[in-house]
């Protein structure tokens, strides 16, 4: 079976999904793209597509809006396409009724070296924990979240300048680079897939609003990591004069002028830059 004989249905929503979508289009017979339905957003209630839908339209791909994943007509649509694989990147948890459809299984690209950082926010948690490296994993999806057999992994170094945006871009491109070999490994060398060691698993739960709030009593390195983990979106924040202020970049500097601990100085008129004095 050549690559172009392999039928793929792609599932994704975000910018992180798009490099793998393009790789699937280039390498395989991409039958359809499943993404969330367009929604009205903002004060003007403008209809916004997911980044995946925007790209799929540009590439003239068949789009299926996955609103109710248990809907019988939706399931029948997928079955009629006779997929060999589902490829899932930054989408939703697929129910077993969908996982049973593809002939050879469903492959997910996860932005950590599983079993480390299972869950919704692996990139953010790697940065919050000040890791010096992370990576991407391809694995076969099973009903439990992020627990399936590992197909392949690639380690990525986290640099001192990385934030969520830059690291996400690196990982999304790395994951796209693994998809061709991962599909072929499932087809021809499935015995080489590796069971995850559940005793080594760590979790990366969804980020809450409380996680975004800076505690100025924390050590400087913790605050710097927090800013990186949430930049450029959704943004770590603090409150000054009862107003919420998002912080997208920070650095540690010496308090050469002996400003009082807790003081804020060197503030420009738009609060786009300022200094905060901390004890450590």
Where are the predicted features?
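N-terminal glycine-/serine-/threonine-rich beta1-alpha1-beta2 phosphate-ribose binding loop
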Residues: 36, 40-84
């Amino acid at each position: 079976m050549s690559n172009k004989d392999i039928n793929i249905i792609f599932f994704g929503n975000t910018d992180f999904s798009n490099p793998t979508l393009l790789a699937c289009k280039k390498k395989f017979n991409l039958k359809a793209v499943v993404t969330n339905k367009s929604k009205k957003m903002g004060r003007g209630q403008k209809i916004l597509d997911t980044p995946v839908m925007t790209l799929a339209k540009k590439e003239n791909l068949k789009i299926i809006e996955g609103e109710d994943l248990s809907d019988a007509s939706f399931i029948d649509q997928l079955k009629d396409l006779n997929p060999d694989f589902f490829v899932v990147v930054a989408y939703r948890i697929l129910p077993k009724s969908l996982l049973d459809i593809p002939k050879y299984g469903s492959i997910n690209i996860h932005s950590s070296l599983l079993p480390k950082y299972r869950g919704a926010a692996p990139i953010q948690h790697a940065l919050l924990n000040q890791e010096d490296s992370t990576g991407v994993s391809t694995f076969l999806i099973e009903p439990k979240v992020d627990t399936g057999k590992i197909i392949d992994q690639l380690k990525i170094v986290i640099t001192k300048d990385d934030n969520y945006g830059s690291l996400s871009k690196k990982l999304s491109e790395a994951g796209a680079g693994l998809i061709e070999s991962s599909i072929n490994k499932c087809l021809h060398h499935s015995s080489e897939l590796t069971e995850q060691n559940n005793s080594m698993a760590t979790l990366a739960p969804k980020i809450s609003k409380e996680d975004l709030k800076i505690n100025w009593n924390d050590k400087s390195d913790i605050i710097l990591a927090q800013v990186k983990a949430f930049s450029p979106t959704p943004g770590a924040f603090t409150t000054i004069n009862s107003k919420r202020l998002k912080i997208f970049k920070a650095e540690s500097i010496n308090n050469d002028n002996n400003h009082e601990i807790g003081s804020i100085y060197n503030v420009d008129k738009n609060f786009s830059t300022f200094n905060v004095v901390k004890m450590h």
